[in-house]
Amino acid sequence: LKIVLIILAVILVFTFMYGMARINDVSMKPAIKDGDLVMYYRLDKRFVSGDIAVFKKDGRTTTGRVVAVAGDTVDITKDGLMINGATQISQDIYFDTTQFQNGVDFPITVGEGQIFVLGDNRPEASDSRIYGCINIKDVKGKAIAVIRTRGL
């Protein structure tokens, strides 16, 4: 009986605190590749720059790196990504940050209860440059682990 209760408790904790999602796009490559499983923590919706958010957009679950939070102003210029007037440089991003022709107009200020996300694979990412800020209510959680599924 104790073993059954322990197993039930583990299942309940995992179900309410954590989640798993298969990511079927290349927006976050190489950090998260097409087909990878992402484990996320559901209970903490406070994001800082650099966190990876797992969220629903257009009926599918995807991921993006948080670059701005409520109150921040995002601009994309010929110099690249700017947050609150400061150029952002990251050794982990291998591509220039550019605007999309049919995307949102910049600069944009992130509203209360929202985040602005970009994919690490900037040329192929479907991110806030296209659909704008993400409402926290659409966020499933904060990514905490990536499980590679290639070859499984």
Q: What function would you assign to each model-found segment?
A:
Residues L1-K2, M28-A31:
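Short acidic/polar alpha-helix capping motifs at helix-coil junctions
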Residues D25:
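A short acidic/basic microdomain associated with nuclease active sites
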Residues F16-R22, P30-L152:
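Soluble "head" domains of membrane/secretory-pathway proteins
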